[in-house]
Amino acid sequence: MKKNYFFIFLFALTLAIPNRMHAQVNSDWQPIFLLVTGGNIMNGVEAFFQLNTCNGEDIIYVKFFNHNNKPVKLEWSDAVFTQELKWINRDKPGDKKSLIIPQNTEFKGECGNSLYPELLIKVKDFVADKKDFKRYSASRLTVIPVQ
C-alpha cells in the first residue's frame, strides 16, 4: 500500500515540477510602463520586458501582445532607466524600431531566435554593468492600425 502512495506522489511531483518551472519563467516578465499612470497596455497592445542572458551576454527581452482584432504596426525607440535614476534614450532617427504584429498575436524576443532582432536589446549598449540597469521602456511607442 505504501508503495502505491509513493508512486502516486512521484507521479504528482513530475507533473508539478514542469509547471513550477514554467511559472518561474513567466514571472520574470515585467510590465513596460507605456502610460503616465504606469499602465502597460496602449491602444490594445500589451508590453513587457525581461532582463536575462543569451550566450553569456546580458540582454533585455521585449514582448508585445496585440489584443486587437486587426494587425498593428508598432514604432518605438529603446530607453533604459538606470539605478542612478537617469533615462538613456536611443531616439536618433536611425534608432527607431518598427514591427507589424498580426491580430491577437504575441511577439517576443528569444535567445537563439533571430526572427525579431528588434526585441533583443544588449544591456551594454546602455550601461556598462547590468547592476546599473533598473527598467526598460519602449519610448515614444505608437500603435498604428494596419489596413
Question: PLM ranges: what are they?
Answer:
Residues 110-147:
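Terminal connector regions
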Residues 59, 71-75, 138-140:
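Exposed beta-strand and adjacent loop surfaces of beta-rich binding modules
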Residues 60-66:
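Short, well-ordered beta-strand segments enriched in hydrophobic/aromatic residues
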Residues 1-29, 64:
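Bacterial Sec-dependent N-terminal signal peptides
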Residues 83-125:
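Intrinsically disordered, low-complexity Pro/Gly/Ser/Thr-rich segments with frequent PxxP/GP/PP motifs
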Residues 25-56:
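Low-complexity, acidic Ser/Thr/Pro/Gly-rich terminal tails and inter-domain linkers that flank the onset
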Residues 69-87:
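Short acidic, flexible loop segments centered on an aromatic residue
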